[in-house]
């Protein structure tokens, strides 16, 4: 699966091309189909003024001019563009430039402009993940049977970049080890963010039995340590505090180094938790982290006790 239909050569046409989507792995896949990123002048977006200067100073008529590749052009994620942003967009449209936007919903001004070439990177879903894994495995010359692909589809997150990175680990295994599901989980599940999210979701939804069962699954095979989970949860609660008073649509305008879709999901998940409750839980996490590091052998017991206290907060 990819965002584009075929591989094409880059042609000097002085037009703006946009590649967008929430999965950065898919964005890079599309870029490699469109052009050779190494042959471009690569720029990471910081602010509109700096970007405008880079584009304005580009000598379009020089023989050695390279197309510009602008990564994570975040100002084009929002609909209410300022005058300066609109002016920058107009300049980009008259430039030999490729822009990436890490969002499934870029600005309407961009989407509705027929003069801009656009490539939408559709996210990996439950319907497509088997195909994505099969294609990535084929590229890496991994011989995975359908049963193995089914198993991988249950433990890998829906993100091409992560899938490719994890499958590269499997190239180091022998054919016999590839058929051993326990070996696969030991290699691939060092830090299962998807399962951590399941645990935090169960806690927020007050599903006590499910949360305790997930703790057994996460920590007993040693694929994740309790302090790692606590660090993840504390960061999530801090983000929940930070977006507490932000309007849902304004989340996409925040200039934070966090995926806005994750921020919106966190905001929705913790919407019924008060500021005092979130603060108390963060303090409890810090205290528990110290206890666990002093009593490593009791880590699972202490974590289960913490989860039960978590539910008591509600």
From Swiss-Prot:
Q: What class of enzyme is it?
A: transferase
InterPro entries from the entry?
DNA_pol3_clamp-load_cplx_C (IPR008921), DNA_pol3_delta-like_C (IPR048466), DNA_polIII_delta (IPR005790), Intein_C (IPR030934)
EC numbers listed for it are: 2.7.7.7
The UniProt keywords, alphabetically, are: DNA replication, DNA-directed DNA polymerase, Nucleotidyltransferase, Transferase
Which catalysed reactions does the entry list for this protein?
DNA(n) + a 2'-deoxyribonucleoside 5'-triphosphate = DNA(n+1) + diphosphate
Gene Ontology CC: one annotated term: DNA polymerase III complex
Superkingdom of the source species? Bacteria
Query: Pfam families, from UniProt?
Result: DNA_pol3_delta_C (PF21694)
Q: Which GO terms describe its biological process?
A: DNA-templated DNA replication
Under PROSITE patterns, the record lists: INTEIN_C_TER
State the Gene Ontology terms under molecular function: DNA binding; DNA-directed DNA polymerase activity
Q: Belongs to which family?
A: Belongs to the DNA polymerase HolA subunit family.
Chain's role: Part of the beta sliding clamp loading complex, which hydrolyzes ATP to load the beta clamp onto primed DNA to form the DNA replication pre-initiation complex. DNA polymerase III is a complex, multichain enzyme responsible for most of the replicative synthesis in bacteria. This DNA polymerase also exhibits 3'-5' exonuclease activity. The delta subunit is the wrench that will open the beta subunit dimer.
Q: How does it assemble?
A: Component of the DNA clamp loading complex consisting of tau(3):delta(1):delta'(1). The DNA polymerase III holoenzyme complex contains at least 10 different subunits organized into 3 functionally essential subassemblies: the Pol III core, the beta sliding clamp processivity factor and the clamp-loading complex. The Pol III core (subunits alpha, epsilon and theta) contains the polymerase and the 3'-5' exonuclease proofreading activities. The polymerase is tethered to the template via the dimeric beta sliding clamp processivity factor.
Query: What PANTHER family does the database record attribute to this sequence?
Result: DNA POLYMERASE III SUBUNIT DELTA
Instruction: Output this protein's name.
Output: Probable DNA polymerase III subunit delta
Native source species:
Mycoplasma pneumoniae (strain ATCC 29342 / M129 / Subtype 1) (Mycoplasmoides pneumoniae)
């Amino acid at each position: 699966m990819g965002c584009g239909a075929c591989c094409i050569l880059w042609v000097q046409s002085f037009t703006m091309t946009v590649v967008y989507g929430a999965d950065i792995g898919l964005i890079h896949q599309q870029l490699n189909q469109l052009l050779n990123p190494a042959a471009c002048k690569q720029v990471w977006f910081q602010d509109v003024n700096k970007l405008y200067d880079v584009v304005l100073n580009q000598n379009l008529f020089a023989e050695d001019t390279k197309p510009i590749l602008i990564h994570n052009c975040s100002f084009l994620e929002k609909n209410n563009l300022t005058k300066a942003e609109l002016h920058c967009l107009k300049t980009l449209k008259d430039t030999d430039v490729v822009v990436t936007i890490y969002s499934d919903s870029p600005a309407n001004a961009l989407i509705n402009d027929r003069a801009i070439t656009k490539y939408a990177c559709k996210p990996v879903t439950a319907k497509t993940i088997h195909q994505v894994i099969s294609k990535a495995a084929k590229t890496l010359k991994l011989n995975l049977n359908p049963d193995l692909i089914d198993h991988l589809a249950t433990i890998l997150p829906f993100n091409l970049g992560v899938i490719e990175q994890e499958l590269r680990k499997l190239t180091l295994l022998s054919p016999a080890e590839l058929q051993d599901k326990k070996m696969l989980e030991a290699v691939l599940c060092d830090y299962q963010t998807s399962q951590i999210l399941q645990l935090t979701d169960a806690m927020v939804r007050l599903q006590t039995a499910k949360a305790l069962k997930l703790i057994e699954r996460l920590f007993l095979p040693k694929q994740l340590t309790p302090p790692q989970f606590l660090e993840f949860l504390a960061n999530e609660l801090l983000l929940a505090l930070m977006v507490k008073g932000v309007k849902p649509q304004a989340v996409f305008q925040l200039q934070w180094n966090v995926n806005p879709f994750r921020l919106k999901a966190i905001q929705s998940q913790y919407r019924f938790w008060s500021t005092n409750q979130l603060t108390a839980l963060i303090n409890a996490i810090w205290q528990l982290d110290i206890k666990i590091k002093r009593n490593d052998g009791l880590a699972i017991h202490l974590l289960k006790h913490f989860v039960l206290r978590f539910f008591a907060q509600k």
